[in-house]
Each structure stands twice: as structure tokens, then as C-alpha cells.
């Protein structure tokens, strides 16, 4: 996060406080519960202890809770099992449509190179159109799910033209290895691992298909009660992001040690990652709204939603 961006984010919080968005802040926070997946910035922030250091003077303990994908993390946010956490673009949309008490706090960039739909190199599947009638592994409600429906729509197809097989990344990896699915839609490091193992045929990249971000989310009530904790946490993430940008080789090594994914794959993933964090802009809201509208149009969510209703603080709207 650049200095300008940090100042801008702090200004948003200050303005929101001045307009009474938060009301009286809680006297203090004993524990901050962070939901994360073992990818990218969360791992680096945890390893370096930047959030712990930022909150130490307040006596706040930081607890990290691991998730395998975004949808269960969003549900944990909704019920207060965790206070803040990271997901891709699709999980908060499904959550908001289901009435989850979550808010968008900040955005993390994605250059779209670390998420793809692919098939094995010896497969007859060479384009998205070739997926018609085929089995495609994907995590339901994940960012890869969004990539899949967007890529199909772009090719004049829909989910009804394929057989989606909803699997966790670990289960999808096994299914792909044993040819129980014909193609796979997934993100790094699973995509990078598949690249190093199979040299797959890339059918679609996120960068060629849609504009997407990763998001730092919070439980709505928690964000309202503890804006100071949110600000300090985002500041700390900015510090970790700057370090990661300047030390991608060390990022790869750290992720390798934490995940046991081979260093070659983690190096590939780290080198194409963009590390930053910034406020939710009008353009980000518009991109996310486009995705939400697509999901409603395709019947993936039960009602239309307005992304702006879930952007925190309300004064950014």
C-alpha cells in the first residue's frame, strides 16, 4: 500500500467517525479473530506478525483461523466466529444475497494471472467451447466459480451446458489427476502446482475474462464497534504488502514452508502475484456489481443485491 493510499484510507475512517457512522467505540478488544486461507498476503502477514505488533499496545490478542475456501470463511464472519478475513470476489456476493452480516473493508488487487480454467495437455479440450458436455471441477461459490460462469457466458454457453463438479481444491486435485473431471477451475497455488505437474492447456485466465479483486471483509457489527482495530489492521497489511512486493523469492519460500506445496509452484505463484491493499473505489464496486448481476441473471443467487449496501464505512458510498 502506498503512503498516499494509507492516508486516503485513514481519511475515510476519520470522515466516517465524524459523521457518526460508528457511534461510540468499544472500550477495547481482547481478541481479534482472523479468517484466512494459506495463500499470498495473509500468510506473509501472519508469519511476520505485523498485525500482532500493531495491536500489541492495546493488549489485543490475534488468533488466526484457517479455511480451505472463501464460502465457509464468509459464513464464519456472518456468525461472528471470526471478525475479519480474506476471500475472492464471489463468496461475499453469495453471502450478501443470503443475508450475511458482512462488509467490504478493503480490496487486494489481482492481475488475473493466478486463476484459470485448464485441461490436461493430451485432452481434446482446447477451448472453453469444448467444455460442452464435460465435467469441470470447481469450488462452489468461489472466485473460480465466477471465472467459470463468466468464461462460459463469453463463449455462448452456460452452466447447464456442462457438468459442474463442486469440489474443494484438494479433492479437485485428486479428481483431475485421475481423470474423474475433464477440466478444473482454480486459483494459485493449486493452478501453479497443476502447471508445474501437467503443463496443462489453459482455456481461460481471469485476466482475459473479468475484472476481479480479492477482498478484506469484516463482520458488520465488529467493523462498527472497532474501527480503530480495522484501521490498524489495514495499516499492518500495507506494511506486509510492501515487504512482499520487494521480496517475492522470500514470499515463495514462506508459502512453500507453510503449505508444503513445492517451491517451484510457489515461486511461479509469487512472481505473478500483486501485493497491495487499498480502499473500495467506485470502479471496484461497479466490477463487483457486474458479477452480482451475472449471478442473479443465471439464477445462482436468489435475489438482486446492491454491493454498495455492504461497503464499509457507509460514507464511502
How does the language model describe each region?
Residues 53-60, 276-284, 307:
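Short, solvent-exposed loop/beta-turn-alpha elements that line the ligand-binding surface or hinge
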Residues 90, 164-165, 170-257:
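Pocket-lining segment of extracytoplasmic ligand-binding domains
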Residues 54, 76, 80, 134, ...:
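Structured segments of extracytoplasmic/periplasmic soluble domains
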Residues 293-317:
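Conserved C-terminal helix/tail region of periplasmic/extracytoplasmic solute-binding proteins
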Residues 224-300:
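Secondary-structure end/capping motifs
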Residues 5-10:
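N-terminal export leaders
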Residues 20-26:
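Sec/Tat signal peptide C-region and signal peptidase I cleavage site
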Residues 27-158, 165-166, 182-186, 203, ...:
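Short, glycine-/small- and polar/acidic-enriched structural segments
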Amino acid at each position: 500500500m502506498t503512503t498516499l493510499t494509507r492516508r486516503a484510507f485513514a481519511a475515510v475512517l476519520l470522515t466516517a467517525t465524524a459523521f457518526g457512522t460508528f457511534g461510540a467505540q468499544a472500550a477495547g478488544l481482547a481478541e481479534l479473530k482472523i479468517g484466512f486461507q494459506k495463500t499470498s498476503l495473509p500468510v506473509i502477514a501472519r508469519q511476520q506478525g505485523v498485525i500482532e505488533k500493531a495491536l500489541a499496545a492495546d493488549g489485543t490478542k490475534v488468533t488466526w483461523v484457517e479455511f480451505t475456501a472463501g464460502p465457509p470463511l464468509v459464513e464464519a464472519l456472518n456468525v461472528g466466529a471470526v471478525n475479519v478475513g480474506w476471500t475472492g470476489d464471489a463468496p461475499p456476493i453469495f453471502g450478501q444475497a443470503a443475508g450475511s452480516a458482512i462488509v467490504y473493508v478493503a480490496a487486494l488487487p489481482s492481475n488475473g494471472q493466478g486463476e484459470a480454467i485448464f485441461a490436461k495437455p493430451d485432452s481434446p479440450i482446447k477451448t472453453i467451447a469444448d467444455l460442452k458436455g464435460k465435467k469441470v471441477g470447481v469450488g462452489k461459490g468461489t472466485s473460480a466459480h465466477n471465472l467459470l460462469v463468466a468464461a462460459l457466458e463469453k463463449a455462448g454457453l452456460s452452466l447447464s451446458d456442462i457438468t459442474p463438479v463442486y469440489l474443494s481444491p484438494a479433492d479437485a486435485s485428486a479428481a483431475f489427476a485421475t481423470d474423474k473431471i475433464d477440466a478444473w477451475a482454480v486459483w494459485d497455488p493449486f493452478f501453479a502446482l497443476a502447471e508445474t505437474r501437467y503443463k496443462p492447456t489453459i482455456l481461460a485466465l481471469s485476466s482475459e475474462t473479468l475484472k476481479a479483486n480479492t477482498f478484506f471483509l469484516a463482520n458488520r457489527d465488529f467493523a462498527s464497534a472497532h474501527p480503530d482495530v480495522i484501521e490498524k489492521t489495514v495499516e499492518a497489511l500495507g506494511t506486509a504488502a510492501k515487504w512482499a512486493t520487494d521480496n517475492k523469492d522470500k514470499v515463495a519460500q514462506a508459502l512453500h514452508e507453510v503449505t508444503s506445496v513445492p517451491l517451484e509452484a510457489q515461486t511461479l505463484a509469487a512472481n505473478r502475484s500483486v501485493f497491495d491493499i487499498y480502499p473500495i473505489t467506485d470502479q471496484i464496486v461497479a466490477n463487483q456489481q457486474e458479477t452480482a448481476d451475472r449471478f442473479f441473471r443465471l439464477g445462482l443467487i436468489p435475489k438482486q443485491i446492491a454491493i454498495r449496501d455492504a461497503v464499509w464505512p457507509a460514507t464511502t458510498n
